[in-house]
Amino acid sequence: MSQPIMLPQGWEARWDPQANAYIYVDQSTGRSQWEVPLNPTFPTSPTPHAPPQRHGRRAYPSAMYAHAYDTPAPHVGPPQPVAGYAEQGTPQFITPGFEGQQPVQQPPYAAVDHVAGQFQQMNIAPGAAPVAGAAAGAYQGAGYAEKQLHSTKTKTVNLIGLQPDVAALDNPPPPALLPANASVTSSAHSQPDPSYQRCTLNAMPTTQSLLNKSKLPLALVMAPYRSIRETDNDPDVPVVEDGVIARCRRCRAYINPFVTFIEGGNRWKCCMCGLSNEVPQLFDWDQRAEKPADRWARKELNHAVVEFVAPTEYMVRPPQPPVYAFVIDVSSAAIQSGMVAVAARTILESLDSLPNADNRTKVAIIAVSTSLHFFSLPADATEAGMLVVPDLTDVFLPKPVDLLVNLTESRPAIESLLAKLSDMFQDSHTVGSALGSGLQAAHQLIGKIGGKIIALGASLPTIGEGVLKARDDPKLLGTSKESQLLNAGNNWYKTFAIECSKNQVSVDMFLFSGTYTDVATLGCLPRYTAGQTYLYPGFNASRSEDAIKFATEFGKVLAMPIGLEAVIRVRASRGIRMSAFHGNFFIRSTDLLALPVVPQDQNYVIELQIEDDIKGSFVVIQTAVLHTTCYGERRIRVITQAMPTTDSIAELYTSADQIALATYLANKAVERSMSHSLDDARNHVTNRLGEMLTVYKNQVTSAAGGASAQLAVPENLLLLPLLCCALTKHVGLREGASIPPDLRAYAQCLLTTLPCQTLIPYIHPRFYSLHNMPPEAGTIGGDDGAMILPPALNLTSEKLERHGLFLIEDGQNIFLWVGHDAVPRLIQDVFDLASYHELQGGKYTLPRLDNPFSERVCNVVDKTREMRRGVYRPQLYVVKSDAEPALRSWALSLLVEDRMDRMSSYAQYLTTVKSKVNGS
């Protein structure tokens, strides 16, 4: 090896055998670099101005994780100063950055010292000019680099006998360690928050054969229209408003933080297909100020998630207004349950909340029983007129105008109708519902414009179009034929849904019934039109808990900002293609998803395949959502994610994201339960887990070949077996002959649409002890000023105490478990009752009493209801330890680490998986 040249005082050269090069260390600061440090006496080019200082928080995982997962962002010490943007002696350009952006082939998980050298000198503020050479990486900060490097070491853990740390479910995914010159700027936001998009693997295998060999699924998990919560301090999505949209001429990718500028900055090289494109003339021009702009401050070069205001060439017609057609069941069952009264009152109270900033929103109301009741709502009237159509076989509109009206212009008539809608049908004794015909009429009303049909049904459609029969045969439950009940019972609904999708019409279903409603069939409408299904079994508005839950959720749906007439397309680097899609949409072509409406916080899963070997050091995946905002603006939301490539199975396992994997497996299990059987779906989850851990044992650990008493997993997948065990016990998949088909079908709707933040607690509930919670729990505190929750417990009945008060919640329901020996003081302080025996179980409204413990318990309950994205308001149940068997069993079924009926405990499940891994 050649000897290093004479170094400045205080510097030391150390030989790195893995990199086959010297690394230079400043002994006074401990900073290391690959470039030879220059002696101050040597002639150098002028030193550029030092960049602005930035906070030393690691760039990725970003602080937005704290918002997505409700945990405070880690505090990192102050940044280390840097000497400049580039190595001294490197020429400086007016348009900096393109000189040092040539791709560098490099393993994503290289030697510690090697990567440390790449990450030093990168403490640069977001939006600052990019640095040249190795200092052009997207992830700056010495503190970040050190944390990243430690996380890349494959640490193997034996699960047998190990109690899972459930608090780790809130941890961010493994970081994507990109080459240092991957990003064109130094922005901390060049990778998307995982609540928008995440991948099951954060390193891309270079070949399909390597992916097949690893047995790891490769899929994107995304919620591109994620809600912005002020309570979580979520930043708004940056908007590019100047109309300058730079796209690749060949693959049509949007310019993003991972492109390369060439030819003096006049052209940019696509990071997906490699084509050279011209930089738009106005790219460096501030049109508002009419002066040159800083290219490196452009939002699309600094943010992974960005929206472009689309020019007219992205429109095939003027922007669609928000349109809401309400189809309300007014049969005797709907009136008697109180559904109609609550629905009408909620719509009335939500008229000001409906998206209507430009006064273009349109509304129609249709009531259905054994006839169709249309309402004429003229702009100059204060009362609505009703027109009844008894013909249900050939649905027609009784009037060409005033049935679909402008909300602002016809507000008096709309308010008058909603105020007395329930009373109009109060004396009706009609049995039966023509819901299908009502849906068809609503489609005729809004089909030429597009919009949303919101259907509220309280009984099975038994007359007119789309007639359904009660097919919930108890003899099928718990058998291989039960999967028939999870598929549509009438093809009319799927055919109608596809017709709606073609006309930009979405359908939301709100279902209320104490009897069979056939959620599996009616759920086809939201599934293919990008809507959502909501179920309220046994709804009775006389119970305030039922009325409040429905009114709250319905009101949030009505107030939700939505995207209209949308399409989603995912593009990826050469060699990667989309192979399968899961979620609520219609697949218009091989890679184009049609969504008449894009609701907030709805999840989609897209499977990926590697068609051709990947040559580059990193790949880029980009999701584009072309949509019309509910405020009449055509926009493109672009989400860009980059990840390094690797040819190592060990690195694939180290990069795997257990939350994304569990989400993928949930979608695949639901799909398999419908195409095969529930038993096959459960086995599929366990078999896929066994295959992954078998490969890990044989290819990564030293225990290859032969049986082992251990069950080895990488540390980043420590909780994946627990999530798989919980998934097989979930009401949507678990074994048993006592689960009503509607509840199972609805659970499967949630499993395939909930975003990760809500899905994981739905699969693996949260469990807290309240009677002995720490004094700070239930109070405001912490760095972010959020409500502090008690420590999460493992989901096992071993944690229950006869004298205790516990909370179990899965995002849909909250159970307060009260032990039989709870002291009277606890009962008095929480429930305002003298003793345990006076306490009634079931749905409950918890009183907020004038004592500190009641205040803290109520705060914890409120926090669990509000801490996640979505419209859901969990119902609260009080469960006494000696409660009625059905309620008690329901609550205990959430303790997924316990043995349940014929299903094994978590410890037994691990033994089963270990047997598969050992090949026995």
Swiss-Prot record:
UniProt record, GO biological process: COPII-coated vesicle cargo loading; intracellular protein transport
InterPro entries: ADF-H/Gelsolin-like_dom_sf, Gelsolin-like_dom, Gelsolin-like_dom_sf, Sec23/24_helical_dom, Sec23/24_helical_dom_sf, Sec23/24_trunk_dom, Sec23_24_beta_S, SEC23_SEC24_subfamily
UniProt membrane topology term: Peripheral membrane protein
Gene3D superfamilies on file: 2.20.70.10, beta-sandwich domain of Sec23/24, Sec23/Sec24 helical domain, Severin, von Willebrand factor, type A domain, Zn-finger domain of Sec23/24
SUPFAM superfamilies xrefs: beta-sandwich domain of Sec23/24 (SSF81995), C-terminal, gelsolin-like domain of Sec23/24 (SSF82754), Helical domain of Sec23/24 (SSF81811), vWA-like (SSF53300), WW domain (SSF51045), Zn-finger domain of Sec23/24 (SSF82919)
Species the sequence originates in: Cryptococcus neoformans var. neoformans serotype D (strain JEC21 / ATCC MYA-565) (Filobasidiella neoformans)
Family designation: Belongs to the SEC23/SEC24 family. SEC24 subfamily.
GO MF entries: SNARE binding; zinc ion binding
Residues covered by the WW domain: 5-39
Pfam families per record: Gelsolin, Sec23_BS, Sec23_helical, Sec23_trunk, WW, zf-Sec23_Sec24
Assembly, per entry: The COPII coat is composed of at least 5 proteins: the SEC23/24 complex, the SEC13/31 complex, and the protein SAR1. Golgi apparatus membrane; Peripheral membrane protein; Cytoplasmic side.
Annotated function: Component of the coat protein complex II (COPII) which promotes the formation of transport vesicles from the endoplasmic reticulum (ER). The coat has two main functions, the physical deformation of the endoplasmic reticulum membrane into vesicles and the selection of cargo molecules.
Subcellular location: Cytoplasm; Cytoplasmic vesicle, COPII-coated vesicle membrane; Endoplasmic reticulum membrane; Golgi apparatus membrane
UniProt keyword annotations, A-Z: Cytoplasm, Cytoplasmic vesicle, Endoplasmic reticulum, ER-Golgi transport, Golgi apparatus, Membrane, Metal-binding, Protein transport, Transport, Zinc
Residues that hold Zn(2+) according to the record: C248, C251, C270, C273
Cellular-component GO terms for this entry: COPII vesicle coat; endoplasmic reticulum exit site; endoplasmic reticulum membrane; Golgi membrane
Segments for region (Zinc finger-like): 248-273
Name of the protein described by the UniProt record: Protein transport protein SEC24
